[in-house]
UniProtKB/Swiss-Prot annotation:
Protein name per its UniProtKB record: Adenylosuccinate synthetase
Organism of this sequence: Burkholderia pseudomallei (strain K96243)
Reported function: Plays an important role in the de novo pathway of purine nucleotide biosynthesis. Catalyzes the first committed step in the biosynthesis of AMP from IMP.
Source domain of life: Bacteria
Keyword Ligase attached: yes
Amino acid sequence: MSASAVNVTPGRNVVVVGTQWGDEGKGKIVDWLTDHAQGVVRFQGGHNAGHTLIIGGKKTILRLIPSGIMREGVACYIGNGVVLSPEALFKEIGELEEAGLSVRERLFISEATTLILPYHVAIDQAREARRGAGKIGTTGRGIGPAYEDKVGRRALRVQDLFDARTFADRLRENLDFHNFVLTQYLGGAAVDFQATLDTMLGYADRLKPMVTDVSRRLYEENHAGRNLLFEGAQGTLLDIDHGTYPFVTSSNCVAGAAAAGAGVGPQKLDYILGITKAYCTRVGSGPFPSELYDADNPSRQDQIGITLANVGKEFGSVTGRPRRTGWLDAAALRRSIQINGVSGLCMTKLDVLDGLDEVKLCVGYKIDGEDVDLLPRGAAEVARCEPVYETFGGWKESTVGIDSWDALPANARAYLTRVQEVAGVPIDMVSTGPDRDETILLRHPFKV
């Protein structure tokens, strides 16, 4: 190592995580922060969650590729903690290249990334259909079964594609197991070995130029003084360990997963930005203490909840499913802040609250008459929570596009001030619209 390399100040690493049940608006914020980053890293999840970006009025939905791909010159990394569908990846690459973006030269995929295969999708969909009314709400894209194979030590990884004979042997062994489950237990059709083998090996040459030792590359980039942004998918309350289990996703969505899922030392994570919507949403099944509206539940049809859904355009960017809506839950937010070690919050979609006569904030719960100030663990306990609210005056003025704190309506400032008091960490950013420039900056995560 040269003397000059020793003296380079390492770059800063910022982790962006959702503090709710996903859909907090992480994609826009990652894109905004990428002005100060030379690389963006996905470290968990798969193509089951979409990040929606509005840039210059044009809508782009990214499911697998990091949001930094929208910025020319920014490197994008898919870490070992991700589960990768080659079919979904190349579909997304094609869409981006059609839009005029260079992708393959800037995308780096960990050789240790787990592959999603056709039998994972088949099992995922067959299981969900079999559950009927007890469904979890999976997207049916094979994410969970792929993670099961990873934990069961039978997963096929990206690097396995480059040894055709070994890949074929392991695929045959896996199909023996999974086809038994599909046909004998789930009542589905078997997945064909040869067709699967041909399809997967067909991706090998296309993937190979993008495959690398991502962990080593991130280490070298950081020590060369380059800033890195770690982009989480889903949200803390969907985390496999810390969420409302079993109504959760199949990976760890918390900030600590950035270290394990990208192969970086945890002490290298300098700042954790918690993305928090100014109200709450949830897709699919599971408890939701502050819920106002659920399109599928006749008993949850509060007009304010309907307004939040309509004004906020609360439909899944990947599935198109309507999201359930409710007031911001600060007791759940506190749980997320503690788990993630959040340095500061970014409040998104504040403008959706414009025009309401009053705004409520859930500050705790009652369970059997007892006060509870933190979201309990596990779905059964969360389902027993009765929300305790504080009520604030609403504001009639539009907050859309406001880019300074002082320009916000007084009641909006009062609401946000109380949120950060209850949360115990500062609000460092506020998003007042979907476009990049519709952002209030109070403290910059890369400059704190």
